[in-house]
């Protein structure tokens, strides 16, 4: 599993896919540039995952594409490889634009593109809010083949004419369900309006609710679809449990009781609001527990340093809002705790997908008050899954 994908689970994935989509069993069968193939193998990929073997060829043909697959199945590499195949590195202009809902995800995508394009002399810039605008302007004026960014900063740079759009061939919307949620919808339209009419659109996400699929009709032409059936979307290899806590006030004591279990590997604890993250972090520290925390209101430098500490394993328990839930890849995370159940059932799968990355075993524990029982049942029904009461030996499941 050097390439980080669980092949057994991958082989069992069911695809509900457009008829014209063929399967390319190897990267060589995709007729990719030699320099790109070298980068793919150097990155640790040996053969394409299920979603890669179906989607890359279609995207490289220039087809508008909707690709849906579980977390940890190589979705980021799917569009990164495709973008690197279609760009011409001789032309130092932006030719592919990737939009993501969080700064951390945009930065991670940039690092994947740089690694896969290592032998291509590719220029890729992360254009994200909370960073120095002067640096953005300098990098963009120099010329970037690929820009990976958040919608607000990208729209701003286009309006200021530092991000030149006339050579853009491909727009990728990653975690499209979140991007197209109300918060980013207008900014995406802002960006889209500036792109050449022939721009290819690629939509990628673990969940694609029907309203998102409906919205894509506005800016996609006859898209090819590579969709996993929803019944297949519960993340295999992740055991899901709940703890009945009756009252909100009891959650804190329950978490303290679990702390020794959390630190066996690394754990992420999700709360629904920034204020709750700050409150819980303070409470845990007052009780002499070591935790770190992150949410969208923190300065970007602080968020970067917290992410780096967590990635390197220097901090073991991270308390966060959903800013962390989407696509962030930290391979050691084996445990996710939903201190609050997510208000949006699509976010449930993004959160628990943080544990068990790339086919490792993971555990997700949901704190459920009497008010939450209905939400939990709704999640079970929506994903055709079963969430059991947590057993006493949860530590054994993690070790």
From Swiss-Prot:
Its EC number is 3.6.4.13. GO terms for biological process: mRNA splicing, via spliceosome; rRNA processing. A motif (DEAD box) lies at residues 174-177. It catalyses: ATP + H2O = ADP + phosphate + H(+). Residues 237-398 form the Helicase C-terminal domain. GO terms for molecular function: ATP binding; ATP hydrolysis activity; mRNA binding; RNA helicase activity. It is found in: Nucleus, Nucleolus. InterPro entries: DEAD/DEAH_box_helicase_dom, Helicase_ATP-bd, Helicase_C-like, P-loop_NTPase, RNA-helicase_DEAD-box_CS, RNA_helicase_DEAD_Q_motif. The Q motif is unique to and characteristic of the DEAD box family of RNA helicases and controls ATP binding and hydrolysis. Belongs to the DEAD box helicase family. DDX48/FAL1 subfamily. This is ATP-dependent RNA helicase fal1. It comes from Emericella nidulans (strain FGSC A4 / ATCC 38163 / CBS 112.46 / NRRL 194 / M139). The gene is fal1.
């Amino acid at each position: 599993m050097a390439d980080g994908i669980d092949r057994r689970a991958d082989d069992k994935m069911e695809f509900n896919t457009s008829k014209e989509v063929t399967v390319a069993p190897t990267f060589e069968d995709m007729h990719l540039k030699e320099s790109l193939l070298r980068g793919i193998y150097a990155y640790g990929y040996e053969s394409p995952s299920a979603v890669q073997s179906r989607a890359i060829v279609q995207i490289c043909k220039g087809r508008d594409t909707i690709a849906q697959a579980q977390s940890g199945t190589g979705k980021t590499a799917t569009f990164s490889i495709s973008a690197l195949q279609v760009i011409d590195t001789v032309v130092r202009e932006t030719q592919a634009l990737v939009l993501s809902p969080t700064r951390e995800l945009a930065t991670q995508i940039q690092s994947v593109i740089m690694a896969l394009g290592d032998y291509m002399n590719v220029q890729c810039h992360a254009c994200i809010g909370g960073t120095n605008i002067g640096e953005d302007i300098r990098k963009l004026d120099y010329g970037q083949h690929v820009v990976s960014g958040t919608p607000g900063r990208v729209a701003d740079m286009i309006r200021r004419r530092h991000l030149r759009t006339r050579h853009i061939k491909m727009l990728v919307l990653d975690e499209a369900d979140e991007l197209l949620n109300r918060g980013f919808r207008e900014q995406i339209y802002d960006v889209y309006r500036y792109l050449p009419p022939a721009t290819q659109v690629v939509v990628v996400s673990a969940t694609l609710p029907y309203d998102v699929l409906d919205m894509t009709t506005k800016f996609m032409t006859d898209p090819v679809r590579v969709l996993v059936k929803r019944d297949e979307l519960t993340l295999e290899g992740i055991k899901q449990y709940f703890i009945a806590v009756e009252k909100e006030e009891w959650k804190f004591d329950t978490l303290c009781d679990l702390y020794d279990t959390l630190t066996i590997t690394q754990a992420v604890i999700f709360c629904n609001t920034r204020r709750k993250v700050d409150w819980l972090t303070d409470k845990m520290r007052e009780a002499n527990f070591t935790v770190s925390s992150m949410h969208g209101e923190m300065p970007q430098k602080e968020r970067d340093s917290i992410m780096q500490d967590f990635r390197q394993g220097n901090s073991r328990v991270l308390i966060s809002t959903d800013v962390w839930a989407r696509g962030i890849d930290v391979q050691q995370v084996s445990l996710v705790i939903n201190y609050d159940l997510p208000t949006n059932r699509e976010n449930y799968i993004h959160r628990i997908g943080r544990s068990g990355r790339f086919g490792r075993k993971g555990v997700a524990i949901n704190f459920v008050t009497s008010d939450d029982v209905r939400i939990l049942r709704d999640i079970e029904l929506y994903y055709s899954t079963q969430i059991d009461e947590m057993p006493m030996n949860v530590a054994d499941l993690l070790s």
